[in-house]
Amino acid sequence: MTESLMGRSACFTLLLGCLLLTGCATTRFEKQAFNNEASAGIKKIAVQQWNDQDEYYARVLNHPGASFGLVGAVIMAADTAQKTKKLNDALDPRNTKLTADFYAKALPGLRQAGYEVVAVPVTRGAQPNLAKDVVRVTKDQDAYLLLTFEGGYLAAGASTAYYPFVAMTAELNDSKSQAVLYKEAYHYGYNSGNKDVVHIEAAADCKFADIDKLVADIEKTRACLTASVDILVNQMVADLKK
């Protein structure tokens, strides 16, 4: 197992912890329902547009290695990297454009909901403050929409099934006052038990007994991820409809 793969595995561990908690903080995720009447003046919005993932993770959340200190952590990272590589060798992120598919439907959906939309490209790995600022300073906007969007496969334990997991957060801010006009978190597929998110079930057959089953029918594995796109787009657009 290469150091780069293990390093990415460690990043996945941190990232997923953030996604499952909808934020790397001890406080609860603070939702904000969209108030159409109060936001009547919002016409033009800048939308944070992330590029696609270069890998889709395959991770066991409660890995046995987590109980054995530093050595266990190394074993866990290596195992996660191996499973992630196995998934991506079959799935091929170049043929699985989950994020691009999301924006291809979300941007027109927001326009149909009554907004003028400007997409602002942001590169994955950018510092959160910089990723926010590049959207916040877009010229002549009334509000800006911050998004996170990440997908992969999760299993609760070493002997439990893998489920698709796509996590998305959306936050609309007033450009002048910086007030939060809308804030919501969505989880598709794997149920983390987090009561602060909108959880959306995946299809019943999107359940894979182990990593070998996960890659045995890769078209089904891909479809179980991409099925999230329409669901999440429709949910967000409905929330923000004018």
Where are these regions (language model features)?
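Bacterial N-terminal signal peptides that target proteins for export
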Residues: 1-14
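A mature extracytoplasmic/lumenal domain signature
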Residues: 49-51, 121, 148-151, 187
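Bacterial N-terminal signal peptides
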Residues: 12-22
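C-terminal/domain-edge helix-coil "capping" segments
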Residues: 24-43, 51-56, 114, 175-242
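Short beta-strand->alpha-helix linker/helix-N-cap micro-motif
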Residues: 111-129
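Surface-exposed short loop/turn segments
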Residues: 25-31, 124-179
